């Protein structure tokens, strides 16, 4: 086993300007390629110096104290929600899915139902960031109502530390893939080093992603980073209906055309009811 090392870098010493016009940033809050090279050089230098000094130190990922407080508060709320399921304390195999459900389809239902058979308890974190066609409240309701019969499944808001503009802004830039950031490191490190241990999650489930480059890369990164913490990443094949892979993007295109007959093939009645409320079918006809 290699020695572990805790490395702290002061970005102010790397870049004294620290503003969006500086060479350090390519966008506000995200460093440029050149900055990455500088940081890598700083890290390598520290590793070499620490090795030469022979210090035994701990290399670990840490988040800022103010965010740590917010994360702890979120996790405490999640734990309280989970305890509403009386059987949860008996479960020794816990899995999780983080999903957007924009909108909730038979494909999402299939992924959840399949995963629920592979663990005692399954946590579904619905992406809370309101950057989708359907607001969080509607998406959360779709998932809640569409999985009500699955007794070992608990539906939860994702908070600001799972697939959010704070942890993985590129997820919400899919319409401009050439501009999207594929940097999911922060998101996955928070999950593997804070969220999963706190909630005793040992498996994370994802659906195969044949279309979306951002999500596909996210799944690949997940297998590497979560694997380092002995968290199994299980990829489940996508559901097909009439030889068509069920995906939310297609449903949204059907909604633009008000093709309700086609939509009915791919979404549960619980989702259909919410869609009709949202799009006010009576007025559109």
Question: PLM features: what roles do these ranges have?
Answer:
Residues 31-35:
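Accessory beta->alpha helical hairpin/"wing" motif in late/C-terminal subdomains of nucleic-acid enzymes
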Residues 1-22, 38-42, 46-50, 158, ...:
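Extracellular serine-dependent O-acyl
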Residues 48-285:
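Nucleotidyltransferase catalytic core that binds NTPs
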């Amino acid at each position: 086993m290699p020695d572990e090392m805790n490395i702290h870098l002061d970005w102010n010493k790397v870049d004294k300007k620290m503003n969006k016009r500086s060479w350090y940033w390519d966008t506000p809050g995200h460093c440029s390629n050149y900055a990455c090279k500088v940081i890598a050089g700083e890290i390598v230098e520290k590793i070499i110096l620490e090795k030469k000094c022979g210090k035994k130190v701990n290399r670990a990922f840490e988040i800022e104290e103010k965010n740590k407080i917010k994360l702890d508060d979120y996790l405490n709320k999640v734990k309280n929600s989970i305890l509403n399921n009386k059987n949860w304390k008996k479960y020794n195999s816990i899995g999780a899915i983080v999903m957007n459900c924009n909108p909730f389809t038979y494909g999402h239902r299939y992924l959840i139902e399949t995963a629920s058979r592979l663990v005692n308890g399954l946590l579904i974190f619905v992406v809370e960031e309101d950057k989708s066609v359907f607001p969080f409240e509607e998406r959360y309701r779709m998932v809640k109502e569409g999985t009500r019969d699955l007794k070992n499944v608990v539906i939860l808001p994702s908070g600001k530390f799972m697939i959010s503009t704070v942890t993985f802004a590129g997820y919400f830039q899919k319409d401009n893939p050439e501009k999207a950031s594929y940097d999911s490191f922060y998101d996955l490190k928070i999950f593997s080093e804070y969220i999963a241990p706190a909630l005793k999650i040992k498996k994370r489930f994802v659906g195969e992603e044949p279309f979306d480059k951002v999500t596909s890369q996210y799944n690949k990164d997940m297998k590497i980073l979560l694997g380092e913490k002995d968290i199994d990443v299980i990829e489940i094949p996508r559901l097909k209906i009439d030889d068509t892979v069920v995906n939310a993007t297609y449903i949204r295109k059907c909604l633009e055309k008000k093709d309700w007959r086609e939509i009915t093939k791919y979404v549960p009645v619980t989702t259909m009811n919410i869609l009709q409320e949202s799009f006010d079918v009576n007025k559109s006809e």
